[in-house]
Amino acid sequence: MLRHSSTPAHVVARDLSVDYVTEEGEREAIPGTLRYDPADPFAVELILRPGEEAITWIFARALLAEGIEVPAGTGDVRIRPTRSKGQTVITVSLSSPSGHADLELAKSKVTAFLADCHGQVPAGRESNGIDWNNELHMLLRTRNT
């Protein structure tokens, strides 16, 4: 994880209800949080709390931003705008060796979250505060141990 060295940590977090869409098309509401830490400027977290333990998925902030407008992603995380119950929602499709899940998030909540994120670190400026010499040093140190 690349660390943004000069940005004060103003973490953005937005709680929201996430609809898990079953294979039968039924929806189950799960408490969730979208989280962005400017110290890790390229990533966002989707934290799901279906029970006692939280499940966290980390993926690119740019992927989320693209996915609210057009289908985005080709790997374990795919994001696209869709219609559900007469409104536009953001569908996040997650795949792992243990299974697959389609989740629906309110587009208005995701859009507001991204606006707050871009207020902390504007799109295209994620790497401006990264100490690249330190990152290289850490990579080389890790490789040599």
UniProtKB/Swiss-Prot annotation:
GO biological process: division septum assembly; sporulation resulting in formation of a cellular spore
Annotated keywords: Cell cycle, Cell division, Septation, Sporulation
Main location: other
GO CC annotation: cell septum
Database matches in InterPro entries: SsgB, SsgB_sf
Keyword Nucleotide-binding attributed: no
Biological role: Involved in sporulation-specific cell division.
Family statement drawn from the similarity comment of this UniProt entry: Belongs to the SsgA family.
Protein name: Sporulation-specific cell division protein Francci3_3418
Protein's organism: Frankia casuarinae (strain DSM 45818 / CECT 9043 / HFP020203 / CcI3)
